[in-house]
Amino acid sequence: KELNYNECKAVIILGNEKVFSAGLNLKDLMSAKETSEVSLIFGTLRDLLTACREFPGPVISIIGGHAIAGGCLLALASDYRYGMHGTHRMGLNEMAIGIDLPPDMLSIISHSIGRENLFEVATQCRMYTPSQAKKKGLINEIIGHRLTGKKKATSQALEEAKKLAKFYIDAGEPFVRLKQSLMHDTNFDYQVLIDNWFSADTQEKVKSV
């Protein structure tokens, strides 16, 4: 559903206690036989990330479960990310299975974690613990401590997210203009990504996952 700023002034993205988002469904990608099918899948992810970045109001993620690949990108497309302690992991594994990270997605990553962490996070395919993720900028703030249950930590994070959202909403147009000024126009022919998906090397890597 299209985000309408007139009807909704803020967005809070919350997964469950096990998974924030695992990204694209590899089974759907593997079963796709036509380039149009793959184009639709990757295009949907691109449109979702663009909607988060272009939404004038605050977009805040609460990450209490695994945030992998496209799920990690979704979190990074948020303006602020709350995390919590747990055994879940967060990271980008696209390169390990031969999937391109286009410039528009790299722009989202760089904007969120800074260029000093971009190369490692984008190329080494590491899966970070919540504490490690915070050090790399994948998470802005961890709610609770190691003995805080996820249900309680999620409740606390939701309250903090609502307060932060109100702060940004009350800031008004200066926040909207600042957010828009941080957007980078990046042109990329997604057909390159789609063609690479069908390459023998990528297909072999995906099958081994």
Cite the ranges covered by each PLM segment:
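Hydrophobic, secondary-structure "cap" segments at the distal end of domains
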Residues: L106-E116
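A short acidic, glycine-rich active-site loop
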Residues: S31-G43
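Well-ordered beta-strand positions
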Residues: Y80-Y82, E120, Q124-R126, Q132, ...
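Hydrophobic/aromatic residues within transmembrane alpha-helices
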Residues: I13, N25, L74-L76, A133, ...
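Glycine-rich beta-to-alpha active-site loop
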Residues: L48-I97, M127
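A structural preference for short, pocket-lining loop segments at secondary-structure junctions
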Residues: K1-K33, A51-S61, M84-R89
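C-terminal long alpha-helix characteristic of the crotonase
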Residues: G83-H88, I139-Q191, K207
